[in-house]
A protein has these predicted regions:
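Signature of the SF2 helicase/ATPase Hel1-core->accessory helical subdomain module
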Residues: 15-150, 157-159, 308, 323-330
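Conserved C-terminal RecA-like helicase domain
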Residues: 1-9, 144-320
C-alpha cells in the first residue's frame, strides 16, 4: 500500500542477468542507472568475471554496498589483479568486521580441518566413523539442552557432505565412483558391518584410532568429552547412532530416485523414515553408479520436494549431500 501500491516487485536470479535481453536473460542495461545495489558474499566474482562486470554496471551511477568476511583472503588469491583490487577496496571500507572479529564475537562456526596423509579404505572408514560420531555428539548435546538453547534459536544439527560437483566421476578398480558414492558406501558399510563399526568406535573413543598428529597424539583426543559423560560403551553408542541419525535399529541402506521431483535422491534404512537426501543435477546417472557399486536402488513416485522439508521442525532428515553451494546455506 501507499508508495508502492501500483508497482509490482519483480524478483530474478542473478544468473539471468546478461548483456542482451533474451528468453531467459535480462539485459543489465534494462535497469535504470540510479541503482542501490546490495551484494552479499561480495568476494565472489571480485577477480573480474562476468558477475563482477554486471554488478559494476548496475551501480555505475548509483551506489553499491558489499558484504564479505573474507575480502582480504580473496584479494590475496587474486594473482595479477591483487594490486588493482587493493586500490579499489581499501579506499571504500566503511566498517572492518572481517572473519576474526565476528568469530571472536561468537558469530562464526567452530571448525576442525584434519588433513590425512593417506586415504586407504581402512583409514577412510575410521575417519568417516569419527565424523559421524562427532555429528552424533552434536545431536546428543542438542537433545539434552533444548530448553537451555531455545532462546538462542539454535536449529537441530544437520550433517552436510559437499563437493565441487555431486556427479564428478572417477574410475577405481575398473568401477565408476565419486565422492558421493564414497559417502554412501561408507554409510552402507557402517550399518551392515556392525562388529567392525563397533570396533572402530571403540578405538576412536579410546584415542587409539591409529591416526596421529606430528607430535604422536591421537587426532581425536579430547574431541568427544560429552559422549564420555554418557558412560555408553561402543556397542551402545552404535545402537543409539542408528536410532538417532538413521531412524533405524538395523537394516540395509536403500537409495531411492524420487520421480516427479527434479534431482533428488532419498536415503533410508529398510522401510524406516528417510534420514537423508541427495540434491543432484542428474539423479539418474548417480543412481546407476550406485547400482554398479552393488547398492540397493529403487525409484519411487514423489509429488513434492523432500529437500524443501529439511528445515521443518518435524523433519527426520539428518544428512544432506550436495554441491558446495550448500556450504553457505539455502
Amino acid at each position: 500500500k501507499g508508495l508502492f501500491e501500483s508497482n509490482a516487485i519483480e524478483i530474478i536470479e542473478i544468473t539471468k542477468l546478461g548483456e542482451e535481453n533474451g528468453d531467459k536473460t535480462v539485459a543489465v542495461d534494462s535497469f535504470e542507472d540510479n541503482n542501490l545495489v546490495f551484494i552479499d558474499e561480495g568476494h565472489r566474482g571480485s577477480s573480474g568475471d562476468k558477475w563482477k562486470i554486471n554488478r559494476d554496471k548496475l551501480s555505475e551511477n548509483g551506489f553499491a554496498f558489499e558484504y564479505s568476511a573474507t575480502f582480504a583472503q580473496a584479494i590475496n588469491a587474486a594473482g595479477t589483479k591483487k594490486k588493482e583490487l587493493e586500490n579499489e577496496y581499501t579506499k571504500a571500507i566503511i566498517f572492518d568486521y572481517s572473519y576474526k572479529y565476528f568469530y571472536n564475537d561468537g558469530y562464526g562456526k567452530d571448525y576442525s580441518i584434519l588433513n590425512l596423509s593417506e586415504d586407504s579404505d581402512e583409514i577412510k572408514q575410521t575417519y568417516l566413523t569419527a565424523s559421524l560420531l562427532s555429528f552424533y555428539q552434536q545431536m546428543k548435546i542438542y537433545e539434552s539442552s533444548k530448553g537451555m538453547i531455545k532462546p538462542y534459536l539454535i536449529e537441530k544439527p544437520l550433517m552436510v557432505f559437499v563437493g565441487s560437483s555431486v556427479n564428478a566421476v572417477r574410475t577405481e578398480s575398473k568401477k565408476q565412483v565419486s565422492d558421493v558414492v564414497d559417502v554412501l558406501l561408507f554409510i552402507d558399510e557402517f550399518i551392515k558391518s556392525k562388529s567392525e563399526s563397533i570396533a572402530n568406535i571403540d578405538k576412536i573413543m579410546s584415542f587409539d584410532s591409529g591416526l596421529q598428529t606430528t607430535k604422536g597424539v591421537d587426532i581425536f583426543e579430547n574431541k568427544f568429552s560429552f559422549l564420555e559423560t554418557t558412560k555408553l560403551n561402543a556397542s551402545q553408542l552404535f545402537d543409539d547412532m542408528l536410532n538417532l541419525i538413521f531412524n533405524a535399529s538395523n537394516g540395509t541402506l536403500h537409495i531411492e530416485n524420487l520421480k516427479g521431483v527434479d534431482g533428488e535422491i532419498a536415503l533410508r534404512i529398510g522401510e524406516n523414515e528417510y534420514f537423508g537426501v541427495i540434491n543432484v543435477g542428474d539423479s539418474d546417472k548417480l543412481v546407476k553408479i550406485c547400482e554398479a557399486n552393488g547398492m540397493s536402488i529403487a525409484s519411487r513416485d514423489f509429488s513434492s520436494s523432500l529437500f524443501k522439508t529439511i528445515n521443518d521442525t518435524t523433519s527426520n532428515l539428518n544428512i544432506l549431500v550436495g554441491s558446495k553451494k550448500f556450504s553457505e546455506g539455502w
